Amino acid sequence: MTARVRFLLLASAAVLTLSACNRDREPAADGAVPAAPGAAVTPAEAAAPLTFSEKTAFATVSLKLPDDIKAQPDLHAKVYAQEVAHLREFAEGAQADNTEAGAPNLAYEQTVELVAAHETGKLMSLKRTAFEFTGGAHPNTVMTGVLWDKALKRQVGWAEIFTKGADFAGLDRALCAAINAAKRARVPDAEPVALGGKDWACPRAAETPFVLAPGTTGGKAGGLTFLIGPYQVGPYAEGPYEVTVPLSAFQSLLAPAYADEFAGSLAKVATTTP
C-alpha cells in the first residue's frame, strides 16, 4: 500500500468517526478513534483547549471549537482528542507523501471548525466543517454533525432519535423537495435532482449528516438541518447546501426517548444558508 493510499484511508476513517453520531453506532465503539502511536494526545492537551494548530514543511493543520462545548467537558475532551489525533495523522500522511515523491513539493492543509448549531434540554448539536487541500483541482469541504446527550454523556444519532423500523420515505421526499428549492434559490436554472437519479441524486435522509434546527418553542428543536457537501446534488461550483426540514415532516417517526426535544415550527423559514 502506498503512503498516499494509506493517508487517504486514515483521513476518511477519522471523518466518519466524528460523524458517527448521525449514523448507527458500532457496538461499544461510541465513536472512539484510537490515535496512532505517533499521534498521541498529551496529558496537557487532554485538558481540552478550544484551539489547536501546527505547521510543518509538509502541512498546516488547525482546529477551532466553540465556547459552548466547555459546558460539556466529556464531549469537549473527546472531540478535542479525536480531532488532534486526526490532524496529526493528516500531517504525517503529508510528510509521507512528499517523502515518497522525493522532495517537499506541496504543502497540504486541513482546518477543522465546530460551531454550535442548537441545544435543547437533553441534546447539544454541533456542526463540524473540515476544509482539506492535498493538491488537485480544488480543495474539499466535508460537513458533519455531532449530537450529544447531555444527561447520558454520550453521542447519539439517527438510530437513537428515530423509531427503529420507521418508514422514512416521506422524510426522504421532503428532503428532496427542500434540496430542489435550495438549488433553485441559488441557481435558478439548476437541474432538479430526484431520489435514484443518475448523475446527481437526492440523498436518503438517514444517510445524510444533520444538526438540530432552532424552533419557535424555547429549548426545543423545530426541525433538522441536513448537511450536503459539494458534488452531492450538483456540480462543485454550486457548493455545499444546508437544507432544513420542519418537524412536521418527521414528528411521527421520533423515538419516545427524544420526541419531547422537538416542538413548534422552524424559527428560520429559509431552506438553506446563502
For each feature predicted by the language model, list its residue ranges.
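Bacterial N-terminal signal peptides that target proteins for export
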Residues: M1-L9
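Alpha-helical transmembrane segments
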Residues: S12-V15
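C-terminal motif of bacterial Sec signal peptides marking the signal peptidase cleavage site
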Residues: T17-A20
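Compositionally biased intrinsically disordered regions enriched in Thr/Gly
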Residues: N22-P274
